[in-house]
């Protein structure tokens, strides 16, 4: 069930035990979303996808990013310059170079935010997101 930006549930409202997650996620999705793993660089399904639509959490369906905020950073993972308001949580990592990003609803690991890298985007941020953490709904599919 995909959720729209207006239907972002409150934080932490979608908690499951590991065995419940394993029953609904692929082994790779579980490794990345629940164990904070990382996709292989350049191999993700959404790295080079620029179709109009919405990217949602593969764990709980919460809408996370609009395609209008996606850009080609050349990093090998899907890159966005901003998230749908309230959809993600950012947690500083040791050293302060990057922030871990997780789904605000199910706490699934999405990737990291890097700031100040000089991209010509409105926020000068790169949300580097694992493809396996995402599901995509084309804007055409809602017509």
Swiss-Prot record:
Single GO cellular component annotation? Answer: cytosol
List residues of the MsrB domain: 18-139
**Pfam families documented for this protein:** SelR (PF01641)
**Primary residence:** cytoplasm
- Give the E.C. number(s): 1.8.4.12
A GO molecular function assigned to this protein is:
peptide-methionine (R)-S-oxide reductase activity
Supply the Gene3D superfamilies for this chain. Answer: Peptide methionine sulfoxide reductase
The positions flagged as active site in the entry are 128 (nucleophile)
Q: Where in the cell is it found?
A: Cytoplasm, Cytosol
> Which co-factor is required?
Zn(2+)
Check the record and name the PROSITE patterns matching this protein.
MSRB
Write out the entry's keywords from A to Z: Cytoplasm, Disulfide bond, Electron transport, Metal-binding, Oxidoreductase, Redox-active center, Transport, Zinc
Q: Which InterPro entries match?
A: Met_Sox_Rdtase_MsrB, Met_Sox_Rdtase_MsrB_dom, Mss4-like_sf
The record's comment on cofactor binding reads: Binds 1 zinc ion per subunit.
Task: Please report any disulfide bonds recorded for this protein chain, giving both cysteine positions.
Answer: 75-128
Q: Can you tell me which residues bind Zn(2+)?
A: 57, 60, 103, 106
Entry's Gene Ontology BP terms: protein repair; response to oxidative stress
Role of this protein? Catalyzes the reduction of methionine sulfoxide (MetSO) to methionine in proteins. Plays a protective role against oxidative stress by restoring activity to proteins that have been inactivated by methionine oxidation. MSRB family specifically reduces the MetSO R-enantiomer.
Protein family membership: Belongs to the MsrB Met sulfoxide reductase family.
- Identification of the protein by name: Peptide methionine sulfoxide reductase B8
Species name: Arabidopsis thaliana
């Amino acid at each position: 069930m995909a959720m729209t930006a207006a239907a972002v549930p409150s934080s932490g409202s979608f908690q499951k035990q590991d065995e419940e997650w394993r029953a609904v996620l692929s082994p790779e999705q579980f490794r990345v979303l629940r164990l904070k793993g990382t996709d292989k660089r350049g191999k993700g399904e959404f790295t080079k996808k620029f179709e109009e639509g919405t990217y949602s959490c593969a764990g709980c369906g919460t809408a996370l990013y609009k395609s209008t905020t996606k850009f080609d950073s050349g990093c090998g993972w899907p890159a966005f310059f901003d998230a749908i308001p309230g959809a993600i949580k950012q947690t500083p990592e040791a050293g302060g170079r990057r922030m871990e990003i997780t789904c605000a609803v199910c706490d699934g690991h999405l990737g990291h935010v890097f700031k100040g890298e000089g991209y010509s985007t409105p926020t000068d941020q790169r949300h580097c997101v694992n493809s396996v953490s995402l599901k995509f709904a084309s804007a055409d599919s809602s017509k």
